[in-house]
Each structure stands twice: as structure tokens, then as C-alpha cells.
């Protein structure tokens, strides 16, 4: 009983976010667990690991196919960032709060995709603001860019920024951002391209909020790259090196050698992978790491032991042979 009362007391004492249109009396009533100093430290640390959060009922319901996480995985690989986790979650406040807090604490660089549109189910900004005890603030520069760059959609030819209408309120929701007044604006809001008004909103120093539209997601992440490169383990941005081998042998036949090889090269930071290709005549073996010179020296050995050859693209030497076992 006493434990439950204590838990209830802690819940009631929890601070809540405040919003631009509310009075200051509705602000934080207790010291936040998430401080500006913590966010500042996260925003400057070396980027070794990453996490990706795909937000959207439409993805979980099968209406939309998520391509952003696959693109982000390739993006991280090209920069030498170790992508540790991808999660797909619903447009649900509690899930967004829990996932963002957890990933922000666990990884150096986190992106979210989806849920920042004008409709009622676009709750990413509000949920992340709540997760980190921040207000939602109308960002004036983002609003100015929106007015200048956005084009009226079909059916909105008579839209006016000067009239207080439901359509105007819906548009404003897309530039009401989680915002910490104790941090520099440039550390919280980035415009990735001159022809885009959609901002990259950075929260708690490492949560980067992106739209779910693939072409915008990709363009904005590409525009962010120059800011990330100086913080990488390899500031030259060379990324990770991958060597592909095509083998006609079933996985069961090469498993012993690959196990021995993996143990031998682990201390060099090299991972050995084996991937069956169902319905194809050849399977794939990979070496992934940063020591290109050492990995290249292993090529003749691997080719010999898997009775295959190095390829540049998986499947480039496929034929019509039979299935291989997994």
C-alpha cells in the first residue's frame, strides 16, 4: 500500500511541459531531469552509435512501406557510424516518449521519422517536447521560410496567413517545435537546404526530428552530413570498408572456416558475415571493418576457402543454379 502511494506521489509531482500560448504558471513545477548542460554535452560528443525511430500507424498497419530506415542504415554505414537499433512505433504519445528517452540515453545520434504534419495524429513534436520537459515554441524563422517557400495545395488557393482559420492553425503546428530557451538556436534548429522550410529540430542534444516523406528525409540527412563529419570517429568521413565474396558453397560447408576466421580477425575490429540467398546459385560472405589494408590482404585466403571470388555487387555472377541450404 505504502509503495503504491509513494509511486502515485511521484507521478503527481512529475513536471509537465508548457506551451507558447499558456501562461508561465503552467510551466515546469519541479527541476527537470533533462538539463541544458546535458543536451549541450550530447550535441558535441563523438558520434559512434546511432538509433532510428520510425513513427507511424500507417507503417505498422501495412499502408505505407518504410524505406527510410534502410536508407538511414546505408547513410550510417557510409559515415562509419554503428547503427545499433531501428524501431517502428505507433503514433502514440507514451511510446514516443519512452522510446525517445531510452534511445537518447543509449546512442550518440538518434533520428525520428514521421508524425510532424498538420493533422491530429501528427504528435511527434508534442510528444518529444513532453518527453524532455520542453515547451512547444513557434519558431519564427521556420514560419518565415514556410510562408516564403511553401506552395498552396489543391483546395487551398484562397488560404491566407492573415486569417485565424483551422487551416492556418494546422500549418502552424508544423513549426511549433520542442525548444530549450537555455540553448543556442543553432544547436536546436537546422535548415538543411535553402529551398526547404522544414527544419531539423534537435532535442536533448541528439534526437533529430525528420519528416517521414522519403525524399525529404533523404535530402535533409544529406544536408546534415557536413555538421556530422567533424564529430565522427573518422573525421575524414571515409566510413566503413566492406568486402563481398560470392561462393557456390552452402553455408554449412563454410561455417567452420568462417567461425575460425571471425575469431582470428575480431581483435582487428573486423566482422565476418555469411548470407544465404534463397533461390540463387551463390551465397555471400562479407568482411566489414576499417582496416582496409589488412582486409585486402585476406582476400586470397577467403576466396580459396569458400571456393569463390570477390565481387563488387551481390549477385553480379548469378546463374540459374539450384537453391543452397541456409
Over which residues does each language-model region extend?
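Glycine-rich phosphate/diphosphate-binding loop of Rossmann-like nucleotide-binding domains
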Residues: 41-86, 91, 293-300
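Glycine-rich beta-strand-to-loop/alpha-helix junction loops that act as flexible
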Residues: 55-57, 112-120, 211, 288-290
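Proline/glycine-rich low-complexity loops and linkers
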Residues: 123-232
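An accessory alpha-helical subdomain
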Residues: 205-303
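N-terminal small/polar loop signature for handling phosphorylated ligands or for N-terminal nucleophile
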Residues: 6-7, 67-131, 148-151, 325
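Eukaryotic N-terminal low-complexity, Ser/Thr- and Lys/Arg-rich leader segments
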Residues: 1-49, 306-326
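Solvent-exposed alpha-helices and their adjacent loops that cap or buttress functional pockets
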Residues: 43-45, 103, 169-170, 174-177, ...
Amino acid at each position: 500500500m505504502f509503495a503504491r502511494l509513494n509511486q502515485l506521489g511521484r507521478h503527481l509531482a512529475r513536471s509537465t511541459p508548457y506551451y507558447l500560448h499558456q501562461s508561465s504558471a503552467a510551466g515546469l513545477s519541479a527541476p527537470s531531469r533533462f538539463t541544458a548542460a546535458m543536451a549541450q554535452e550530447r550535441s558535441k560528443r563523438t558520434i559512434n552509435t546511432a538509433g532510428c525511430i520510425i513513427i507511424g500507424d500507417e507503417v505498422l498497419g501495412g499502408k505505407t512501406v518504410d524505406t527510410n530506415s534502410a536508407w538511414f542504415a546505408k547513410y550510417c554505414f557510409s559515415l562509419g557510424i554503428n547503427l545499433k537499433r531501428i524501431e517502428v512505433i505507433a503514433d502514440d504519445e507514451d511510446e514516443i516518449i519512452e522510446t525517445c528517452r531510452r534511445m537518447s540515453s543509449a546512442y550518440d545520434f538518434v533520428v525520428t521519422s514521421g508524425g510532424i504534419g498538420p493533422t491530429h495524429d501528427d504528435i511527434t513534436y508534442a510528444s518529444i517536447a513532453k518527453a524532455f520537459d520542453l515547451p512547444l515554441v513557434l519558431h519564427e524563422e521556420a514560419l518565415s521560410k514556410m510562408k516564403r517557400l511553401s506552395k498552396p495545395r489543391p483546395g487551398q488557393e484562397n488560404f491566407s496567413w492573415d486569417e485565424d482559420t483551422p487551416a492556418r492553425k494546422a500549418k502552424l503546428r508544423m513549426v511549433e517545435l520542442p525548444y530549450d530557451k537555455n540553448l543556442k538556436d543553432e544547436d536546436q534548429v537546422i535548415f538543411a537546404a535553402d529551398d526547404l522550410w522544414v527544419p531539423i529540430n534537435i532535442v536533448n542534444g541528439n534526437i533529430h526530428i525528420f519528416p517521414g516523406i522519403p525524399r525529404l528525409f533523404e535530402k535533409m540527412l544529406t544536408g546534415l552530413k557536413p555538421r556530422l563529419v567533424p564529430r565522427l570517429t573518422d573525421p575524414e568521413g571515409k566510413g566503413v570498408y566492406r568486402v563481398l565474396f560470392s561462393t557456390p558453397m552452402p553455408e554449412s560447408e563454410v561455417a567452420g572456416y568462417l567461425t575460425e576466421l571471425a575469431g582470428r580477425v575480431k581483435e582487428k575490429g573486423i566482422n565476418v558475415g555469411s548470407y544465404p540467398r534463397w533461390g540463387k546459385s551463390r551465397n555471400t560472405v562479407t568482411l566489414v571493418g576499417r582496416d582496409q589494408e589488412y582486409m585486402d590482404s585476406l582476400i586470397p585466403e577467403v576466396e580459396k576457402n569458400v571456393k569463390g571470388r570477390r565481387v563488387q555487387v551481390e549477385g553480379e555472377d548469378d546463374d540459374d543454379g539450384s537453391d543452397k541450404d541456409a
